[in-house]
Amino acid sequence: MNKLMSWVSVLIILPEAFAQTDLRGKVFVFPRESSTDHVTLITKLEKPLKNLTLCLRAYSDLSRGYSLFSYNIHSKDNELLVFKNGIGEYSLYIGKTKVTVRATEKFPSPVHICTSWESSTGIAEFWINGKPLVKRGLKQGYAVGAHPKIVLGQEQDSYGGGFDKNQSFMGEIGDLYMWDSVLSPEEILLVYQGSSSISPTILDWQALKYEIKGYVIVKPMVWG
């Protein structure tokens, strides 16, 4: 009887761990540097990506480099990675190849980041606080692998692991959305302004499935 009750409890608890949650007006708070604390984002991505756009808001007072978004597949790390190298310097990795852009930033201050990549041309773009940076190019003709492990707060050196405290994120992340297309400049501006008129196809902050591991707290956004 006790075993039966235990299994019933597991069946009740597990769906809640991966519940689809509306996080509008909220953030994930990563209160410390660590090699363990992270959030796994859950999505059913069955096909490789030939186009993508990722947008998020972040607030951190770290001056060292850290991972903002880590997407790995079983066969390789850094399949898709957004990494902040230092104040005003951002890198996008596609298939372990990277491009880097630089922006003028106040430090510390909240930032809205969008990045996109188009396989047919290889063109990668960054938009910081609604303003476009100089375009870069990488991995023309490539396809980003499917069935990913997506992690916030840490940079993966293996599938879902291999974390390094010196690359961990400390601060707050919110309003994260991802599409399987390259958004137009007009659409990027709408996202920056907080519009929800452009429906995300991969990750949606207003209907997010996630799992928290370690010391990460969901709190109201007070700086957006």
Curated annotation (Swiss-Prot):
Pfam families, per database record: Pentaxin (PF00354)
Cofactor binding note: Binds 2 calcium ions per subunit.
Chief site of localization: secreted
Cellular component aspect of the GO annotation: extracellular space
Binding of Ca(2+) 1, residues: 77-78, 155-157
Pentraxin (PTX) domain mapped to chain residues: 24-224
Glycosylation sites: 51, 166
Cofactor: Ca(2+)
Residues annotated to bind Ca(2+) 2: 155, 157, 167
Signal peptide limits: 1-19
Stretches assigned to coiled coil: none
GO molecular function: calcium ion binding; carbohydrate binding; complement component C1q complex binding; identical protein binding; virion binding
SUPFAM superfamilies: Concanavalin A-like lectins/glucanases (SSF49899)
InterPro entries membership: ConA-like_dom_sf, Pentaxin_CS, Pentraxin-related, Pentraxin_domain
Subcellular locations according to the entry: Secreted
Disulphide connectivity of cysteines: 55-114
Quaternary state and interactors: Homopentamer. Pentraxin (or pentaxin) have a discoid arrangement of 5 non-covalently bound subunits.
Alphabetical list of PANTHER family matching this protein: C-REACTIVE PROTEIN-RELATED (PTHR45869), SERUM AMYLOID P-COMPONENT (PTHR45869:SF5)
Name of the molecule in the record: Serum amyloid P-component
Gene: APCS
